Design a protein with these regions (language model features):
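Outer-membrane beta-barrel strand-turn architecture
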Residues: 5-8, 51, 59-63, 150-154, ...
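Solvent-exposed loop segments that connect transmembrane elements
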Residues: 27-42, 82-134, 170-202, 234-256, ...
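Gram-negative outer-membrane beta-barrel transporters
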Residues: 63-67, 153-158, 275-277, 282-286, ...
């Protein structure tokens, strides 16, 4: 993060470079077979690189103020790398999986033909029955933006903003194994059981923003905003074989989904006092091509451009100092999220609630500032409420995330200007309640019935030092 004062304006250059690596070996039971089938799953050295560059030029305060900038984001998966492996523990279990998961006889399949990349030194060889491999997967987003503020007087400010963006991506990936015996790769010359997908795409658009801000007095501000935003589209993993007979998935799944467009209108109030502050915002969002996360009966999740939708509601945050040591804060939102059109392939009618949207959530915090062994310290207790959401437009409680409430506790000490010690307890009362329920009959040969609980009480001790 580099800042420089050029005199007439300020410049800020922000560069971020991250590498993320994920390795794991998991003992699991495939959901399309009996629970007792041993079928290890390997995430083998998944590595991705993310690079962000942003340059902002910012004017000095005055009657007319401006900010212009450049933003670039790049994502790359490790090229020519194995992403995932599933294998049986011996030949007998491999033949069991072949028969019941893919309808294959022992002589129909030979895992040794997929070398490379799955050779003798690979864990699970030669009892491999599914794997994925990335030749390349690249994404890039570039945008230029500007915001221009005109201070009409000490109370009134008018704002105009613009953002021009372009998104490009390209990928080539392979899947191998018993589920793809009718495929022979991109060029048709690979061994049977090689599924290849080569994808690329790009899109660009320009979005605008308009705003007005009026300071009634030092303690009260009113504002209104109208802006067009977007959530980036991209490519997604192919449907797994057990979704091949799912009618809903086959009707609307696509390896590529586009960016959506959100036309947002907001009206807000900011109030301040000697011992309090409050912000209240009403928002209304008209979506076009909204990205909906779909969970069909086969249990897979994917993104789908669901046409037009509308979300509207309120956001509130409030702080109140009871005295010099004790303060309260509240933040919450309540909204409705509905499709504006019929989506026959998903069984949705205009006015139905959008899947996987939490319409109500809030947090209430109590803070006590004190000293412990002469160190400035604080204790904080939070009550968190998470509203329910449903996987489908049908709002089936057997495919949903029920609402729940939990308590969190934090105790922090400022050991010096640079070092801090913090004790955190998540789910203080060790509440045991459902976080996710999935119990539906699907198009595979057996129903899927399982449940996730919210994480149990978790205690974390963290020491941080700032240089």
């Amino acid at each position: 993060n580099i800042k420089y004062d050029f005199g007439a304006f300020d410049a800020n250059l922000i560069i971020s470079d991250r590498t993320v690596t994920d390795d794991s070996v998991t003992d699991w039971a495939r959901i399309d077979m009996d629970d007792y089938v041993p079928a290890p799953l390997i995430v083998d050295g998944d590595k991705s690189y993310q690079e962000t560059t942003e340059l902002r030029l910012i004017s000095k305060p005055g009657k007319f103020e401006w900010t212009v900038g450049y933003y670039n984001y790049k994502f790359n998966e490790e090229p020519n790398s194995v992403s995932q492996t599933q294998y049986a523990v011996d030949q007998d279990w491999l033949e069991y999986v072949m028969l019941y998961a893919a309808g294959l006889n022992p002589g129909d399949y030979d895992a040794t033909v997929y070398c490379p990349p799955f050779c003798e030194d690979h864990l699970g060889y030669p009892y491999f029955y599914y794997g994925s491999y990335t030749e390349y997967n690249e994404q890039e987003e570039t945008s230029f933006y500007g915001q221009f503020d005109y201070n009409v007087n000490d109370k009134l400010t008018l704002t105009f903003g613009i953002r021009d963006y372009e998104i490009e991506d390209a990928s080539k990936s392979y899947q191998y194994g018993i589920f793809f015996m009718d495929s022979n790769g991109c060029d048709g010359n690979d061994p049977a059981g090689t599924d290849c997908a080569e994808l690329s795409g790009s899109e660009s658009d320009t979005r605008m923003k308009y705003a007005i801000n009026y300071m009634v007095n030092d303690d009260l501000t009113l504002y209104a905003t109208q802006a067009a935003g977007y959530r980036p589209g991209g490519n997604q993993a192919p449907l797994p074989p057990f979704c091949s007979s799912d009618e809903a998935a086959q009707a609307n799944f696509s390896r590529r989904f586009n960016s959506d467009e959100a036309e947002t209108t907001e009206f807000g109030v900011k109030a301040r006092g000697e011992n309090y502050s409050a912000n209240v915002t009403y928002f209304d969002v008209d979506w076009d091509g909204i990205i909906i996360q779909v969970t069909p009966g086969c249990g897979w999740r994917y993104n789908f451009n669901g046409g037009k939708a509308e979300t509207s509601g309120w956001e509130v945050d409030f702080t109140y100092a009871v005295n010099d040591e004790i303060s309260l804060d509240f933040a919450g939102s309540s909204m409705t999220a509905e499709t504006s059109i019929d989506i026959s392939s998903l069984g949705a009618s205009a006015g139905d609630r959008l899947p996987n949207t939490v319409e109500t959530q809030w947090n209430l915090g109590l803070v006590y500032d004190t000293t412990i062994m002469s160190y400035p310290s604080y204790a904080r207790l939070d009550v968190n409420y998470y509203g329910d959401s449903f996987n489908t437009f049908a709002e089936n409680p057997n495919s949903s995330s029920p609402d729940y409430t939990k308590l969190n506790f934090n105790l922090g000490l400022d050991l010096s200007e640079y070092s801090k010690l913090q004790l955190s307890v998540d789910n203080l009362t060790d509440e045991r309640t459902e976080a996710y329920v999935y119990a539906v009959d699907d198009t595979s040969w057996r129903p899927r019935n399982w449940m996730q609980w919210i994480p149990p009480r978790t205690v974390t001790l963290k020491y941080s030092y700032s240089f």
